[in-house]
């Protein structure tokens, strides 16, 4: 496809409700740092990981293959500002309002692409173990930002206060330019000091352990177990919503502490 089509896709993504959008090559995404490190990370269970029909965690080696004909991947981001916390409130089996918005954005954008550009598209599950991808890595490859000291995607426009989804495209699209953007180099990292469980206090990963030089939180100082413990506590402190489902309000202190993208 011509560059004109890529520009059309990114413009259409915003018309369909995305705050940001970018394009990456499937081959590049499949070799992203998280994909390379995944099999070396040990136990990957916890809050937000998928389970089967018997409520058992799905083994991380069980990763469905993407369609062979898929050549490109579109990443869409939705701004999640501090004054709209409800976008991220988990409400039982229905997930979060923000994720439902992203699903609809991807669906309508896919329909537009198939009609206007005559190319096939394929939905992606949120979970890697069910055919999804590591969305932060994909977003970096799609030119949306960089991975910060808080192990989150940092965008120039909104900092880490975005939520992501993606889908696959049969067409071989030109990827969006990678961003020359690194706001963390001279930052005192308030995201780390504000963490209530000090999940980013001490390095727990090395490049040798994970088989990639790009390790979590840049220097390996991201303890997923501690972060997961905070999320478990958030679940225990959840409130019952109008639908009688527990409404979980997960910690976002490291997001709010980040100065990037603030007015």
Kindly give the residue locations of the regions a language model identified:
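Non-catalytic, usually N-terminal nucleic-acid engagement modules in DNA/RNA processing proteins
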Residues: 1-93
């Amino acid at each position: 496809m011509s560059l004109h089509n890529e520009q059309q896709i990114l413009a259409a993504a915003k018309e369909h409700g995305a705050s940001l959008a970018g394009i990456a090559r499937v081959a590049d995404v499949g070799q992203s740092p998280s994909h390379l490190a995944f099999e070396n990370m040990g136990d990957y269970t916890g809050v937000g990981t998928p389970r089967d029909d018997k409520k058992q965690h799905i083994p991380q080696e069980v990763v469905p293959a993407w369609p062979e004909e898929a050549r490109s991947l579109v990443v869409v981001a939705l701004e999640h500002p501090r004054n709209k916390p409800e976008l991220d409130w988990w409400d039982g089996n229905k997930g979060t309002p923000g994720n439902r918005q992203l699903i609809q954005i991807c669906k309508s954008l896919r329909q537009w692409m198939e009609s206007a550009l005559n190319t096939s598209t394929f939905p992606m599950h949120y979970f890697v173990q069910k055919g999804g991808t590591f969305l932060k890595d994909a977003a970096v490859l799609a030119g949306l930002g960089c991975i910060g000291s808080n192990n989150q995607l940092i965008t120039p426009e909104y900092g880490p206060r975005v939520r992501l989804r993606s889908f696959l495209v049969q067409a071989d699209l030109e990827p969006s330019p990678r961003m020359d953007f690194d706001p963390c180099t001279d930052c005192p990292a308030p995201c780390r000091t504000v963490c209530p469980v000090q999940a980013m206090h001490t390095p727990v990963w090395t490049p040798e352990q994970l088989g990639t030089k790009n390790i979590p939180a840049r220097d390996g100082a991201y303890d997923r177990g501690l972060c997961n413990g905070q999320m478990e506590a958030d679940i225990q402190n959840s409130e019952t919503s109008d639908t009688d489902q527990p409404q979980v309000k997960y910690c976002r202190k490291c997001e709010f502490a980040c100065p990037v993208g603030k007015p």
